[in-house]
Design a protein with these regions (language model features):
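N-terminal basic/disordered segments at the start of proteins
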Residues: 1-18
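Structured loops at beta-to-helix junctions and adjacent beta-edge loops in soluble globular domains
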Residues: 6, 146-148, 158
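An N-terminal, globular interaction/scaffold subdomain
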Residues: 16-118, 123
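Glycine-rich, often proline-containing surface loops adjacent to acidic residues and nearby aromatics
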Residues: 96-108, 142-144, 162-169
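Extended, Lys/Arg-enriched charged tracts that mediate electrostatic binding to polyanionic substrates
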Residues: 109-137, 196-201
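Hydrophobic, well-ordered secondary-structure segments
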Residues: 117, 121, 125, 142, ...
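Short, glycine/charge-rich beta-strand/loop segments that flank catalytic centers
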Residues: 134-147
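Loop-centered beta-sheet repeat module
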Residues: 150-201
Length: 202
């Protein structure tokens, strides 16, 4: 039996500080019954957290940090025919603006209904399709886009970005697809900012 414990450790100073005084007796009892196999601390700046890297290795995925097919897998689970195209996850989320940073809050806090999210998705679908993307609605919190050149785009796991500044996770601006995605991201923000559903929720 293998047990994978997501978020059980982090190389960051903040995590080490919390773990010093954190009592987890039930987890300690379970871990005492097991022998550690591999340990992957990773770097806090890697685009993929350790538990996702472990799963990617177990499934023999090719790619590397920030380039594993998580979006295609999620889309397939949402009954979208993914074929052999490269997919990206588009997640409705609130970005909190600070004086010198932009923080992404947990998308779950939006509590979008499927009806609300579907209407927002339809409002921006054309932006993606006009640039050659296939766009698909998965659920209230999962929209998808597909285009062959997304395969080379390095993207961060939501688990890395939530609660943190987004700037360090928005890599690949130098590539053509990276610049296109950043431009579309800005255009989507403009459309959604003034959308009636967004205004009703404020």
């Amino acid at each position: 039996m293998h047990l994978l414990v997501p978020f059980a450790s982090d190389a960051s100073e903040a995590c080490r500080h919390v773990l010093r005084d954190l009592a987890l007796p039930n987890l300690a009892r379970v871990l005492a019954l097991l022998s550690p196999a591999d340990r992957d601390e990773g770097e806090p700046s890697s685009f993929t957290p350790p538990h996702e890297r472990a799963l990617a290795a177990a499934w023999h995925w090719q790619g590397g940090d920030g380039r594993w097919p998580w979006a295609a897998r999620a889309a397939a689970n949402d009954t979208i025919a993914v074929g052999d195209r490269a997919w990206a996850l588009v997640t409705p989320a609130h970005w909190q603006l600070g004086r010198d940073h932009v923080l992404m809050t947990d998308p779950a806090h939006l509590s979008l209904t499927d009806t609300e999210s579907s209407a927002l998705f339809e409002a921006v679908r054309g932006l993606f399709e006009s640039e050659g993307f296939k766009a698909a609605f998965g659920s209230a919190s999962r929209w998808y886009i597909a285009r062959d050149d997304l395969e080379g785009l390095r993207t961060a796991s939501l688990d890395r970005v939530i609660g943190r500044g987004v700037d360090s996770w928005l890599g690949n601006e130098a590539s053509a697809i990276g610049r296109l995605v950043r431009r579309l991201q800005s255009e989507v923000q403009l459309v959604l900012h003034t959308h009636p559903i967004n205004e009703e929720r404020e």
